[in-house]
């Protein structure tokens, strides 16, 4: 009985959406801030959104490259900047999703709900675009076995963002229901 009341009042889907949102945020914080965006972090290779270090045999250590050298290696400055903007912009927009969702749930305001949907859609597009753009530039130095836990975390966050977008569209806030339904007869 209590379970059906929670479902009918739209509380259970809302709690599920908020839990999934917290999980997506944790995964993005882990990959982009804790792991510093490094998709490959090995003793002989470090490739991330802000690090590009390859092993130099003659030096016997990692040599990190910046933009004049990165252009020679085939990584354009504008492309890398757009990839960074995409993934870190997705994190920033996702941070702002819970507040409009909370306000939409408790005020039953459709405008705030639409704002949360727009933030989720933009975050999903930015994360997918930034990650695919970055991987297209650095894939010739990466192998599947080189990848660390940051890439699966970002891919799982992308899946959660898509699922959140679908769930948020599927379960919009409902209008306030009258407590006394006998008066409507």
From Swiss-Prot:
<dbReference type="GO" id="GO:0016020">
    <property type="term" value="C:membrane"/>
</dbReference>
<feature type="topological domain" description="Extracellular">
    <location>
        <begin position="136"/>
        <end position="145"/>
    </location>
</feature>
<feature type="transmembrane region" description="Helical">
    <location>
        <begin position="14"/>
        <end position="34"/>
    </location>
</feature>
<feature type="transmembrane region" description="Helical">
    <location>
        <begin position="115"/>
        <end position="135"/>
    </location>
</feature>
<keyword id="KW-1133">Transmembrane helix</keyword>
<feature type="topological domain" description="Cytoplasmic">
    <location>
        <begin position="106"/>
        <end position="114"/>
    </location>
</feature>
<feature type="topological domain" description="Cytoplasmic">
    <location>
        <begin position="167"/>
        <end position="185"/>
    </location>
</feature>
<feature type="topological domain" description="Cytoplasmic">
    <location>
        <begin position="1"/>
        <end position="13"/>
    </location>
</feature>
<keyword id="KW-0472">Membrane</keyword>
<feature type="transmembrane region" description="Helical">
    <location>
        <begin position="146"/>
        <end position="166"/>
    </location>
</feature>
<protein>
    <recommendedName>
        <fullName>Transmembrane protein 140</fullName>
    </recommendedName>
</protein>
<feature type="topological domain" description="Extracellular">
    <location>
        <begin position="35"/>
        <end position="84"/>
    </location>
</feature>
<feature type="transmembrane region" description="Helical">
    <location>
        <begin position="85"/>
        <end position="105"/>
    </location>
</feature>
<dbReference type="Pfam" id="PF14985">
    <property type="entry name" value="TM140"/>
</dbReference>
<keyword id="KW-0812">Transmembrane</keyword>
<dbReference type="InterPro" id="IPR028038">
    <property type="entry name" value="TM140"/>
</dbReference>
